[in-house]
């Protein structure tokens, strides 16, 4: 009995060291060697200062910026420690009220816009941290951003097109626009 327990304990310690220490250190080392930016969280820098991540949305609220998807992370938008969906069903009165409020806010921000409001501007993603919107969501906001920045709508549309990523390998996912990168392109213009 003691020899069996000793063998089990030894195997437990060995596998803990292999899978809990050696393997993660090895994989992290490989990632930092071959994909240093990705392994560090895809941080976006402006000069020497980190201003965000390509992978986590930010709470842009100024009219001169494109707005991302609503965050489902509670009172602090885009809080990575509170990541998760709202878990509200489509008939949940709280979700219906939240969507109506978001629609009203978008209409108030650009009352002359007659385009249909894309779904991703009024509903949160599964993680609540999505950094990207659809090209349609960017197009919907283009007139508001152009007016706020006193830019031509054509220039704003060119920036949207330049920052639109196609499907991965032509088949996976949907075309998308990273909101942080698009807003940085606007600031650089």
UniProtKB/Swiss-Prot annotation:
Its main location: membrane. It is a single-pass membrane protein. Pfam families: KdpC. GO terms for cellular component: plasma membrane. One of its GO terms (molecular function) is ATP binding. It is found in: Cell inner membrane. InterPro entries: KdpC. The keyword Cell cycle does not apply. The chain crosses the membrane at residues 11-31. Keywords: ATP-binding, Cell inner membrane, Cell membrane, Ion transport, Membrane, Nucleotide-binding, Potassium, Potassium transport, Transmembrane, Transmembrane helix, Transport. NCBIfam families: kdpC, PRK00315.1. Part of the high-affinity ATP-driven potassium transport (or Kdp) system, which catalyzes the hydrolysis of ATP coupled with the electrogenic transport of potassium into the cytoplasm. This subunit acts as a catalytic chaperone that increases the ATP-binding affinity of the ATP-hydrolyzing subunit KdpB by the formation of a transient KdpB/KdpC/ATP ternary complex. Belongs to the KdpC family. The system is composed of three essential subunits: KdpA, KdpB and KdpC. This is Potassium-transporting ATPase KdpC subunit. It comes from Polynucleobacter asymbioticus (strain DSM 18221 / CIP 109841 / QLW-P1DMWA-1) (Polynucleobacter necessarius subsp. asymbioticus).
